[in-house]
Amino acid sequence: MYDKNQVTRCYDLAAEAYANRFFNELEGKPFDHNILTWFSRLIPGHEKVIETGCGPGEIARFLKDQGVNISGIDISQNMIKVAKRLNPDIDFSQGDMLNLKLENDSIFGIVAFYAIVHFTLPEVKLALQEFKRALKPGGYILFSFHIGSGVLPVKDFLEQKNADADFVLFQVEDIVKVIDELDLDRQEVITRYPYINREYESKRAYILLKKK
């Protein structure tokens, strides 16, 4: 089960190390670069997008530079401080993706790159249900996750003492089943192999959904 306090503490402790490690990682990930560019072209210029689990804001930064009207939330206050420092022109705030402070049918796009990695499958369903609630009809969700099975307990994440958290791997078919139960329109389900020596060596999935 998702331990909100543990995850918050982990990223509060690891915020600076995380930014140092990952803020510029898109430069070495052409697939991610391309899929985010593709997503940005689905968003009309006046519509708003929110990134959940934004970390230091590397995904929001990329989308902002593509002309997307984006903001970001993260459960970690320290991560939000880092994101604001690195991206002073983007609105970031502390928030919970399981309880978005958004009205029903109020936003056109939601991005969640590896933001579900601490959830169990039932909690993934809750997150997607919350995304659907906030999304305008015709709006999009783009999210990604590590493919596999089981839970990986991590101690001292990024060598930061007491930054502990459980990372969860998912099978694509299990996530797809959840999506279909929520009656979200699957636009694309794409997988890729890891970039060797550049990232954690798991296969990854990227899913684009549309609210009917």
Each language-model region and where it sits:
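A short glycine-rich, Lys/Arg-flanked "PGG" loop and its adjoining helix->strand segment in the class I
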Residues: 125-137
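Short alpha-helix
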Residues: 167-182
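A short acidic, Gly/Pro-enriched loop at the edge of an enzyme's catalytic core
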Residues: 98-110
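Class I SAM-dependent methyltransferase SAM/SAH-binding core
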Residues: 50-52, 56-99
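Core SAM-dependent methyltransferase catalytic element
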Residues: 195-212
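Conserved S-adenosyl-L-methionine
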Residues: 184-195
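Conserved class I S-adenosyl-L-methionine
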Residues: 1-44, 142-166
